[in-house]
UniProtKB/Swiss-Prot annotation:
SMART domains: fCBD. Residues 107-468 are annotated as: Catalytic. Residues 19-54 form the CBM1 domain. This is Probable 1,4-beta-D-glucan cellobiohydrolase C. The biological conversion of cellulose to glucose generally requires three types of hydrolytic enzymes: (1) Endoglucanases which cut internal beta-1,4-glucosidic bonds; (2) Exocellobiohydrolases that cut the disaccharide cellobiose from the non-reducing end of the cellulose polymer chain; (3) Beta-1,4-glucosidases which hydrolyze the cellobiose and other short cello-oligosaccharides to glucose.
Length: 468
């Protein structure tokens, strides 16, 4: 859908019109506020719902959409949950079809898929840090910001239009490996485009609707990802599969949208696991986090669901295990359980993993795990409640990606959530506003999910543990 450019709007509107501050919203569906930016900033469209005043002129702001990102549709990288007592109500943070069994694998790759590889630093995230964050940072923070931009993080494929970006990155990795990268580089992507996505919340609604051919569209999306992976069979690729999706089926079937999506979610995830079961791939299904599925009432049903999904897909050899704490804040290991975890003995990710792993093994799946440590550097957190997921105040970057986890069940600590991208808007008039983003423990004002949140990035940088 065509949109009038910010420059054209500036020519059409009176010069006396109110101007939006740097990093403020300046456009989007339903927006009635200022559409001009203060001097030194330009209004840049991030997605149909949100345009933001970014540093620079209208010309330089186009660096936001370089060849490393195919579309400006919102990147929603949020995994959410809210807990009460011993139970949890979750609220999530050219297609080529290729088929055939000749490229699937029938025996599992041996060992930890992270061992012997270095991880790819997400070029789009690096561009966000250098073009959006650093121009307005204090000089004392610039070295730390530059270092953060180099930390490998996952690229989120949250719309079908972004799948070709895989080809750009995989080609770059292939070239670097051919040039002698030592150890060789591995790619990291998040598969995140289910129909009726984010079924228990509003902040990260996706592009597909079950009622409007969403399942068929999702399968085309997976086929396109498979085609990219087949084009680069010599690039080792690690995938996180559908944050929040299966966890919502454990705790949120009382929500009509989730109940209606249950069969579609299972069908789509099953299709993804089968089609992406390739020799150069290692997959981890998202498994929420300790404050979501670690509760006594939830952990058994969660293990049953995950093991069932594993078996229903034919025990894919490329399916290594589960990803936890995606886009969340939990400690991996904490000596004293925080007060907001009261009632859940599994008060950190280490305890959660150690509790669910034997339940999975009892049902035939010897699963391993990865843990997102991108925003868990401050412990305990400043959450008023464990389920407060949106742009939580006081957080910091956590441990950098490593295979040195101290737990043989845990393959690696990783950065799945790109730190500095918003979890959701605090603007209550927005179509995608979720009340969690207006809570007192959420940093405000906040832009739409997936768009750059300068104040949050600075918070993560200042509170990084270990420091940069």
């Amino acid at each position: 859908m065509g949109r009038v450019s910010s420059l054209a709007l500036a020519l059409l509107l009176p010069a006396v019109q109110a101007q939006q501050t740097l990093w403020g919203q300046c456009g989007g569906i339903g927006w009635t506020g200022p559409t001009n930016c203060v001097a030194g900033a330009a209004c840049s469209t991030q997605n149909p719902y949100y345009a933001q005043c970014l540093p620079g002129t209208a010309t330089t702001s186009t660096t936001l959409t370089t060849t490393t990102r195919v579309t400006t549709t919102t990147t929603s990288t949020t995994s959410k949950s809210s807990s009460t007592g011993s139970t949890t109500t979750t609220k999530s943070t050219g297609t080529t079809t290729t088929s055939g069994s000749s490229t699937t694998i029938t025996s599992a790759p041996s060992g930890n898929p992270f061992s012997g590889y270095q991880l790819y630093a997400n070029p789009y995230y690096s561009s966000e840090v250098h073009t959006l964050a650093m121009p307005s940072l204090a000089s004392s923070l610039l070295p730390a910001a530059s270092a953060a931009a180099k930390v490998p993080s996952f690229t989120w494929l949250d719309t079908a239009a972004k799948v070709p970006t895989m080809g750009t990155y995989l080609a770059d990795i292939k070239a670097k490996n051919a040039a002698g990268a030592n150890p060789p580089i591995a790619a990291q992507f998040v598969v995140y485009d289910l129909p009726d996505r984010d079924c228990a919340a509003l902040a990260s609604n996706g592009e597909y609707s079950i009622a409007n051919g969403g399942v068929a569209n999702y399968k085309k999306y997976i086929d396109a990802i498979r085609a990219q992976l087949l084009n680069y069979p010599d690039v080792h690729t690690i995938l996180v599969i559908e944050p929040d999706s299966l966890a919502n089926l454990v705790t949120n079937l009382n929500v009509a949208k989730c109940a209606n999506a249950q069969s579609a979610y299972l069908e789509c995830v099953n299709y993804a696991l089968i089609q992406l079961n390739l020799p150069n791939v290692a997959m981890y299904i998202d498994a929420g986090h300790a404050g979501w599925l670690g509760w006594p009432a939830n952990i058994g049903p969660a293990a049953q669901l995950f093991a069932g999904v594993y078996k229903d897909a034919g025990a894919p050899a490329a399916l290594r295990g589960l990803a936890t704490n995606v886009a969340n804040y939990n400690a991996f290991s904490i000596s004293t359980c925080p007060s907001y975890t009261s009632g859940d003995a599994n008060c950190d990710e280490n305890r959660y993993i150690n509790a669910i792993a034997p339940l999975l093994k009892d049902q035939g799946w010897d699963a391993h795990f990865i843990v997102d440590t991108g925003r868990n550097g401050v412990q305990p957190t400043k959450q008023n409640a464990w389920g407060d997921w949106c742009n939580v105040i006081g957080t910091g970057f956590g441990v950098r990606p490593t295979t040195n986890t101290g737990n043989s069940l845990v393959d690696a600590f990783v950065w799945v959530k790109p730190g500095g991208e918003s979890d959701g808007t605090s603007d209550s008039s927005s179509a995608r506003y979720d009340a969690h983003c207006g809570y007192s423990d959420a940093l405000q004002p906040a832009p739409e999910a997936g768009t750059w949140f300068q104040a949050y990035f600075e918070q993560l940088l200042k509170n990084a543990n270990p420091a940069f």
